[in-house]
UniProtKB/Swiss-Prot annotation:
Residues 15-26 have a biased composition (Low complexity). GO terms for molecular function: secondary active sulfate transmembrane transporter activity; symporter activity. Keywords: Chloroplast, Membrane, Plastid, Stress response, Sulfate transport, Symport, Transit peptide, Transmembrane, Transmembrane helix, Transport. Residues 1-23 form a transit peptide. Residues 518-642 form the STAS domain. The gene is SULTR4;1. One of its GO terms (cellular component) is chloroplast membrane. Expressed both in roots and leaves. It is a multi-pass membrane protein. NCBIfam families: sulP. This is Sulfate transporter 4.1, chloroplastic.
Length: 685
């Protein structure tokens, strides 16, 4: 009788008729060296017929236990993160650094804030308002010590687009809606922080973020060209209407604003790049916006060129308390509020975590999100529009060696002094100077280096970058975000439902088994297929896994090259060490697969499941179904045992050899491999 002609059922029945016999008779002729097998300890499920139900109260047991352990100091640190650095502040070491960093960022923020307010379709003073109260509040409630918050270009463009279809920029309603938007954004950020939902943003690919940001930067830059050209262009978040209006108004082109704007832009770019290239001159990077403002204001005040439009009168004094109005438009603004909240998570939390890692302290992204929310809520009570973390100002703050949130308080003081004493001077600032500051700031957001990197490394991510940036350019920022997020989620779902599965082979001279496609020298054995599943197994991917296993069973010649010739697969070994989780649907599907294998005389073996996976399998009854003797600690143990059966098919007394080795799972079962009872195998210490 050949090995292939013996079914599992026949072998099991032979075991029941074979009797106990002496152990020495179990050693097949010609077998001289025992196989060493490490016994796999199976979990005790005698008192756990089914997984224990989890009481509703236990779901929050971790939180309640943590709350009970919290002391008064812990509560203060949680509610007011600033106390973490206040208690340990080293005045002699930190104050000078924080002072210089705060002044540097403040000097940079004043012109930027006015520029971004113009981008949002608001009077410049509202940029300063958005840089005042939110900065102070964030210094108290924010957990990052280097993040610089305030108006940013991308959020300003989103505000302009959201409000453009509701109210004209000259209307008071436009301002009221921008302030209401800050309140809505703050509420959403607080809710997400309290519910610890910051992890949702992980589903958005970095290539999507880069493509969206790059396209938005191009749109922002083009929208500011009107101040260089001297005539109005279409307000749009799409590139085509902007370009068409630029071409259509070419006959209105004026040289003075173009020359002044271009000159200031060149100066800004040179100072920025020199400051980044040389550490001893990094102050130039922060001073660049102020330099552009001073230069433009001086030219405008001295020469009074009539074709260059100026900012005009700016109210003097600090913002007054007022509650946001126009709540009847709140429902219309909710989608934009959600979008700005997403940008805040991407931009602010991403920067804050990177800076925290660089400065070696822990940062909770949910606490950070809550701090941003409080800053926007309180800011909206003092005429601020949505504020978030800035790439450029945070980088300058960190490069200036800011140590704590005190630098943010000093930045707020600089803004307050500007509101109290400097606003009369701002009326002579040319519009083209503010536009140059915006263009200079967003030019660094066009991430063409990332596109080149993605093309070289990962074509799929490059396609994501290209799709997102193209859709954003031609169909608008909102559509671009939705499409980018949709593609990100589609890729996540595809990867989850189609996990990587590898056929393993043995590396020559070792007991190590690796992917045969990655290691061509690895060899496998005829009649045995070893499959590694590199993901959790659950309802969404179990069907794909079963289909792949069936493919490997059919394509036996493709994956085998050593051992005795057999006409089909007799053993399938599942290497489950990478499997971190398995759900009930997957377990039921594996049980069905085992029964399917059984009808075709194929034995299933499982290697190295982790504790949780092993426990789930045991509770489902699969261990008893397959047999405890077919669960192994190592792939090599499973292969050696399977090889014994394959090799014994050519030895004398085949029936007895097969019978004793294919002992039924219900007979002589123990917590260790049943074959360990035979002298053929020994336990490896």
């Amino acid at each position: 009788m050949s090995y292939a002609s013996l079914s599992v059922k026949d072998l099991t029945s032979l075991v029941s008729r074979s009797g106990t016999g002496s152990s020495s008779s179990l050693k097949p002729p010609g077998q001289t060296r025992p196989v060493k097998v490490i016994p796999l300890q199976h979990p005790d499920t005698s008192n756990e017929a089914r997984p224990p139900s989890i009481p509703f109260d236990d779901i929050f047991s971790g939180w309640t236990a943590k709350i009970k352990r919290m002391r008064l100091v812990d509560w203060i640190d949680t509610l007011f993160p600033c106390f973490r650095w206040i208690r340990t502040y080293r005045w002699s070491e930190y104050f000078k650094l924080d002072l210089m960093a705060g002044i540097t960022v403040g000097i940079m923020l004043v012109p930027q804030a006015m520029s971004y307010a113009k981008l949002a379709g608001l009077p410049p003073i509202y940029g300063l308002y958005s840089s005042f109260v939110p900065v102070f509040v964030y210094a108290i409630f924010g957990s990052s010590r280097q993040l610089a918050i305030g108006p940013v270009a991308l959020v300003s463009l989103l505000v302009s687009n959201a409000l453009g279809g509701i109210a004209d920029t000259n209307e008071e309603l436009h301002i009221e809606l921008a302030i209401l938007l800050a309140l809505l954004v703050g509420i959403l950020e607080c809710i997400m922080g309290l519910l610890r939902l910051g992890w949702l943003i992980r589903f958005i690919s970095h290539s999507v973020i880069s493509g969206f940001t790059s396209a938005s930067a191009i749109v922002i830059g083009l929208s500011q060209i009107k101040y260089f050209l001297g005539y109005s262009i279409a307000r749009s978040s799409k590139i085509v209407p902007i370009v068409e209006s630029i071409i259509a108004g070419a006959d209105k082109f004026q040289w003075p604003p173009f020359v002044m704007g271009s000159l200031i832009l060149v100066i800004l770019q040179v100072m920025k790049h020199v400051g980044k290239a040389k550490k001893e001159l990094q102050f130039l990077r922060a001073a660049a916006p102020l330099t552009g403002i001073v230069l433009g204001t001086t030219i405008a005040k001295v020469f009074h060129p009539p074709s260059i439009s100026l900012v005009g009168e700016i109210p003097q004094g600090l913002p007054t308390f007022s509650f946001p109005r126009s709540f009847d438009h709140a429902k219309t603004l909710l989608p934009t509020s959600a979008l700005i909240t997403g940008v805040a998570i991407l931009e602010s939390v991403g920067i804050a975590k990177a800076l925290a890692a660089k400065n070696r302290y822990e940062l909770d992204s949910n606490s950070e999100l809550f701090g941003l929310g409080v800053a926007n809520i309180l800011g909206s009570l003092f005429s601020a529009y949505p504020a978030t973390g800035s790439f450029s100002r945070s980088a300058v703050n960190n490069e200036s060696e800011a140590k704590t949130g005190l630098s943010g308080l000093i930045t707020g003081i600089i803004i307050g002094c500007s509101l109290l004493f400097l606003t009369p001077m701002f009326k002579y600032i040319p519009q083209c100077a503010l536009a140059a500051i915006v263009i200079s700031a967003v030019s660094g957001l066009v991430d063409y280096d990332e596109a080149i990197f993605l093309w070289r490394v990962d074509k799929r991510d490059f396609s994501l970058w290209t799709i997102t940036s193209t859709i954003t350019l031609f169909f608008g920022i909102e559509i671009g975000v939705l499409v980018g997020v949709g593609f990100s989620l589609a890729f996540v779902i595809h990867e989850s439902a189609n996990p990587h599965i590898a056929v393993l082979g043995r590396l020559p001279g070792t007991t190590v088994y690796r992917n045969i496609k990655q290691y061509p020298e690895a060899y496998t054995y005829n009649g045995i297929v070893i499959v590694r599943i590199d993901s959790p197994i659950y309802f969404a991917n179990i069907s794909y896994i079963k289909d792949r296993l069936r493919e490997y069973e059919v394509a036996v010649d493709k994956y085998t090259n050593r051992g005795l010739e057999v006409d089909r697969i007799n053993f399938v070994i599942l290497e489950m060490s990478p499997v971190t989780h398995i759900d009930s649907s997957a377990v039921e599907a594996l049980k069905e697969l085992y029964q399917e294998y059984k009808t075709r005389d194929i034995q299933l073996a499982i290697s190295n499941p982790n504790k949780d996976v092993h426990l789930t399998i045991a509770r489902s009854g699969m261990v008893e179904l397959v047999g405890k003797e077919w669960f192994f600690v190592r792939v090599h143990d499973a292969v050696q045992v399977c090889l014994q059966y394959v090799q014994s098919s050519n030895l004398e007394d085949k029936h007895l050899s097969f019978t004793r080795r294919y002992g039924g799972s219900n007979n002589n079962s123990s917590s260790s491999n049943a074959l360990l009872k035979e002298p053929l195998l020994s336990v490896e210490k």
